[in-house]
Amino acid sequence: MDNMNNNILLIMLAGILAMLFSFWKTSWINKQSQGNDRMESIGSSIADGAMAFLRAEYRILTVFVIAVAFILGYANSGRSDSSAIISLSFVIGALASGLAGFLGMKVATKANNRTTHAAESSLARALNVAFSGGSVMGLSVVGLGVLGLGGLLYLYSNMYGFENSSAVSMVLNILSGFSLGASSIALFARVGGGIYTKAADVGADLVGKVEAGIPEDHPLNPATIADNVGDNVGDVAGMGADLFESYVGSIIGSMVLGSSILVAGGMDLNFVILPLLIAASGIVVSILGTFMVSVKEGGDPQKGLNQGEFGSGLIMVGVIYVLIVKILPESYFQGGVSYNSTGVFYATIIGLFGGLGIGKITEHYTGTGTKPVKSIAEQSMTGPATNIIAGLGVGMESTAVPMIIISASIMGAVSYTHLTLPTIYSV
């Protein structure tokens, strides 16, 4: 149990490191020049609008979270496999998800005009400011995720014990409330923010092009501010909450399934804690990866981003191998059959490279100057009808390869783990 607590504290330390790095990046962004008065004025208007939306949304969500927490606590009170304290997990999950979105959007609205000003003199500096703003969102998501999960796991494991299967089952059931809280916020933030974004976008089009005869993004069009507010609300706060929910859900799901693996006739808690350890290690590697992102003047920013992404991925392969070799036994039992733990490593690596592959495919179908994007642009020359048809066709085509990658990843993970539960580590 002492070893378990030490591992949890290390996991929480990684979360604290992520938050400290985020605050450092935020401080650096605040020190950058905001540009001329016009840039500062527009940036301030966008920031004010984004925060006004978020305040209104969070006021409504507060009522929802309190009501659902009460229902969850009442429904789980007196149960042998759960507890009313699941409502605490739910509330903390909702708070963490909301906070991740708030921090990300706060920094994004500060980085907007600073990136514009930096781009006047240097592409490399503009990328640095923009990427720093994005890294705050990403590291806030993972930092709050492992902090919340690690803190609650430490609390519940000491409250209910973590020595037998029934205690572990209860702790994980209660912990799942954290994921439910995150999912609840993600639903409202993503859908609500997305609807606002599209409404503002179409409104800007109608007002500008139809009524006033001015471009959509012209500063004289008041709907332009609302459109940019929507971009921050939907694509930063909403996306952040969505990623937080997916991140937390995949970790908890792996922990629950890992609890059923037997070693020497009993449960091995290392299979339960492994997903959190991998996530915590990923935070440290991701921070290192931010220093790999760079671009020369006149270079391609996407190549600079790919450097950090694939560099981090390669480092993570070695980290995962060391973790699995150090903390997992050489063999485990599932369904009465013995298997080798190296299968867990292969399943995890397959999932890692599957994700990187999907990212590259997405870049191919949406990146600047790529063949699919150029084909859509060429169709625009003959009218909106052909443009819509081409865009729809490319969009449908773009789903094929990711589906193949996902299917191949599942089959590959299954082949190495022989259709046992460690296959789930490929997430």
What are the functions of these language-model segments?
Residues 2-421, 426:
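Hydrophobic packing and interface segments
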